[in-house]
C-alpha cells in the first residue's frame, strides 16, 4: 500500500506569496508577474511531467494560458492580505502507472473542482526528481 499524503495550503499575499511565482514553479515555466513586475523562471527545475489548466464551462478561454490566468488573479485580488489560491499536494500511488495516476489526478480535478465552478492548474512532478506534487 502506498503512502497517503493529502495536504491543502492557502496561497496568501499576506504571507508574501505570489500566485504567478507559485504557478511558474509548479509548471516548471518562465512567467512574468505584472503585479510585482518580476520574472519567475523555473525552466531549469525539471521533473514536471504534466502541467495543464482545467476550466469550467463559464470560464474565459484566455485562462487556458497559465500566465494570463495567474496575473489576472493577482490583479483581481488586490487586498494586501488576499487569499490568492488553494494548493493541494497529493502523493501519487506507487502501485499505479504514471498514466493511471494522471487519469486519477484529472478525474479528481474535474469532479471536485471544475464541476464546482473552479479553475484548476494541475501539475504532476516526476517522483524520481522530487515530491509528487499537483
PLM segments and residue spans:
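N-terminal nicking endonuclease/strand-transfer module with a His-rich metal-binding environment
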Residues: 1-134
Amino acid at each position: 500500500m502506498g503512502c497517503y499524503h493529502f495536504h491543502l495550503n492557502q496561497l496568501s499575499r499576506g504571507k508574501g506569496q505570489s500566485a504567478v511565482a507559485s504557478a511558474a514553479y509548479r509548471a516548471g515555466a518562465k512567467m512574468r508577474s505584472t503585479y510585482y513586475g518580476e520574472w519567475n523562471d523555473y525552466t531549469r527545475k525539471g521533473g514536471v511531467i504534466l502541467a495543464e489548466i482545467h476550466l469550467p464551462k463559464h470560464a474565459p478561454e484566455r485562462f487556458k494560458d497559465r500566465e494570463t490566468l495567474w496575473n489576472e488573479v493577482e490583479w483581481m485580488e488586490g487586498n494586501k492580505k488576499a487569499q490568492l489560491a488553494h494548493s493541494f499536494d497529493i502523493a501519487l500511488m506507487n502501485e499505479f502507472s504514471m498514466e493511471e495516476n494522471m487519469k486519477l489526478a484529472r478525474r479528481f480535478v474535474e469532479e471536485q473542482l471544475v464541476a464546482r465552478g473552479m479553475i484548476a492548474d494541475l501539475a504532476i512532478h516526476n517522483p524520481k526528481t522530487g515530491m509528487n506534487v499537483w
